[in-house]
């Protein structure tokens, strides 16, 4: 921590760093023009940056330059159990590698406070119609995840600076919003803005509090944990003015789905957005958090709101200590982070969105930005006539209706609205269709408390929306098994079946293998679709049922009134609910425990936790990038779900066959996500998504075949993807992937990069990369290359029979040459952009990846190498 510009913070016993003065010393009047994001980035530079580099770094912010890397030091790391556990498995493996080289493994610890929340591993096996669902699902979770939880329990005592929130307590982002973020930190006698990275792409949810909080891959999180600065260049900072107010009956879900479509079209990929204006002022933190949560769905890095009266009200509502709330207000007003101080901020680009334009909305059938106003569902071909045969499910059957996800369960207005629509439906005798698997999985225990306080929990339970978990569940693809009779009918009749959920992602195949497509909706709409029973139902016009007098009941007859929603929220949501939930939860993590052995005792038969191989053989050092054959040629919009799916493992998959050989019963296969601590299981998930289109595999008419398929070259044999990977691994064949635009969008899972790296992929050439996945590729020693504008796999007529090599001096964003050697003997040289974006990334790449770099640097510092 530096000493220059450190001053007493008026009205407190703390100091602060006077960022305004530091900026004004370089350019008078500049601070008032800085956006909110730049002010926070500047503060941490003044506090932590090497004093000799400070002026040049601050000039990047003042002059809006992007030609110099500067450090970012996040105050905290938050992890969920999948990527967090994977990161800690990597650190445990790093300890083994250090010990093998003669270093002290006990010295490998996170130096930045790290919070791990177990929220991703519970599947909804018992539905919300089962009164014992919560207990049953938790028992199954514990049984299936014994190996994982054994390891996680070891980390509590083996590593310093790691807090673990055990399963059954809520979702990482909602806990971060409601409790973990102080908004303003106070450590070592200094107050400064809270900042955070998290191993999940929805980490920006806390941006709603004015906290820069961004999603990163597990590899980058490990780097931050170990105290390394995250090097960055000034991002694009885009102002988004929200005008008007939401119309009556419109939810924050409707708003965010409309905004997601709008921002996707405006191409804000990688940008930091700052929302302001009368519309932003009118939104509660619950509404703001819904927008910030879906940052990755519109491709941005952050979605900031300023600290204002709404922020203070929320901190009080969620039971923060009075002293902490006062500190947030004092600090924000004194340092120019209060909303009123941002009226002079200048943006290089400003977008405007009118909240009054928002209608009731679904998103689907395959993307969160596929915005569908409910008034136009018939026009869009989603709603339409269907035949209802006695005893059979209809076309478009809604087999899953899930109130799920921190995106929506963190907003009391949404949850109360769901309770009220259930109450109104129950009064009129409406019921859930029998084929609909319904569930309620709040991101916080407080949700159940205030629904009970409002007498709405029993209303939801009557319709089958009992609490199944306090975890991610269906939103994360952990929707659990269907009733076997329903699953068999879907197969036998080849039925088009769907899911409706209040989640944030609906990529094909994500929610359930039998839900061919999925739609995102507000919690009250999810309840309505459970009653309707099919996506073919025109939700605004068709009759949901008939009242006791035989009158048709439509959506407008049961939709709750805004005034009643607000009155119930005001009366039923109380600070003591948050305190009674979180004080005991965090007290558990603070109890002192005896230190564990610094080296983990790996279980050799485990299919969940295994010593990683990243410090061995070909995983170390820079790749040659010669003689590479394509593993796949891929279209636009390849997601990390395509690259490494998260949903249930089926027996006929490569991972399922492996687990069967290892003696795991099929009912305990669990999800792909839960096995990511074992590379032998997880690497078999690479490209295992049945919705994949590999353009190297075509039918006799030349049409691309769907499935986890590959073509082994040079013999041209079509196989399942894993068999192709195994074949190439045996041959020690270096591989390349050719792809379209927006490669790697979606979840921040590092296994989307680890899987291809272990398969032998040395480079990926695409028209564009999503930010987190590109960083993960670098972290695994895989070279990301970008075609120049106008060049694509189509213009180059790439068919997969080629071999490739890359030539040129590797440096940040350098132009390199991709040489294609065609099967007919011809060659073609193509300029490509090296997407190692910083000098630090070049250094990591040349070491073979971030984990290999850690080991090198640690041993050098210890003198053991």
Model segments located where?
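Terminal amphipathic helices with adjacent charged low-complexity linkers/tails
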Residues: 73, 91-147, 274-275, 280-385, ...
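Extracellular/luminal Protease-associated
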Residues: 243, 276-283, 504, 722-770
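Acidic, glycine-rich flexible loop/linker segments
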Residues: 547-562, 568, 572, 773-844, ...
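Mobile "lid/hinge" segments at catalytic clefts and subdomain interfaces of large enzymes
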Residues: 37, 187-329, 337-338, 414-417, ...
